[in-house]
């Protein structure tokens, strides 16, 4: 089974990806992971990507596509794969489909973990971490016993820069701009499925398993 995983930052994609990978015995392929693997392995594709990244430039679509194509051509992807973080654009989606058609293959499901923007905003901006031991908290779902103080070591808890309101808003704006056209694309391809990501982890996965079991 060949699956594309879609969803906003903070929707729990990483957690569900691990569960899907284990349940269906397919590799979870994160774009970030394969970029890092190519760069650390000093592959030709990795060195090209590093050249752009070192200059603070976005890696071009063509190179990103080549890196993904190389990864899904490996033996462990013969029975399928789960792509997380790719495609990000319709151009990438079309290139992936063209590559798969050439191999007489296709995407079986574009799975959207759907969480309303307001819910994601609250999830992310409410996160806190201990400034010393790194313990994780949330002001609403998992607060410290004493406000602002780590339960484990007594150090102050802080909000990471990535979780500030401005940063989260920008990340969600970027996601909306990039992903809405992808959702339309995969809906038109009749492979889009959606699950309610506001539920607890086990219930979300139960819904995912039911959706994928029907394919």
From Swiss-Prot:
Its main location: cytoplasm. Catalyzes the reversible transfer of the terminal phosphate group between ATP and AMP. Plays an important role in cellular energy homeostasis and in adenine nucleotide metabolism. Coiled coil: none annotated. Pathway: Purine metabolism; AMP biosynthesis via salvage pathway; AMP from ADP: step 1/1. Belongs to the adenylate kinase family. It comes from Clostridium acetobutylicum (strain ATCC 824 / DSM 792 / JCM 1419 / IAM 19013 / LMG 5710 / NBRC 13948 / NRRL B-527 / VKM B-1787 / 2291 / W). This is Adenylate kinase. The lineage of its organism: Bacteria, Bacillati, Bacillota, Clostridia, Eubacteriales. GO terms for cellular component: cytoplasm. AMP binds at residues 31, 36, 57-59, 85-88, 92, 160, 171. It catalyses: AMP + ATP = 2 ADP.
């Amino acid at each position: 089974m060949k699956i594309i995983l879609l969803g906003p930052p903070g929707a729990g994609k990483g957690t569900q990806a691990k569960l899907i990978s284990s349940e269906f015995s397919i590799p979870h392929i994160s774009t970030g992971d394969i970029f890092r693997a190519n760069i650390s392995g000093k592959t030709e594709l990795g060195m090209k990507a590093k050249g752009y990244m070192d200059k603070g430039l976005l890696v071009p679509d063509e190179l990103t596509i080549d890196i993904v194509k190389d990864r899904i051509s490996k033996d462990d992807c013969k029975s399928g794969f789960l792509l997380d973080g790719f495609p990000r654009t319709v151009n990438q989606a079309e290139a992936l489909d063209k590559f798969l058609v050439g191999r007489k293959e296709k995407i079986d499901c574009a799975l959207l973990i759907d969480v309303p923007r307001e819910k994601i905003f609250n999830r992310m901006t409410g996160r806190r971490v201990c400034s010393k031991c790194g313990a994780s908290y949330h002001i609403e779902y998992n607060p410290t016993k004493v406000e602002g103080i780590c339960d484990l070591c007594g150090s102050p808890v802080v909000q990471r820069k990535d979780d500030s309101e401005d940063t989260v808003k920008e990340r969600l704006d970027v996601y909306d701009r990039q992903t809405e056209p992808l959702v339309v694309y995969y809906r038109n391809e009749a492979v889009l499925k959606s699950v309610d990501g506001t539920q607890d982890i086990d219930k979300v996965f139960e819904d995912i398993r039911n959706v994928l079991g029907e394919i």
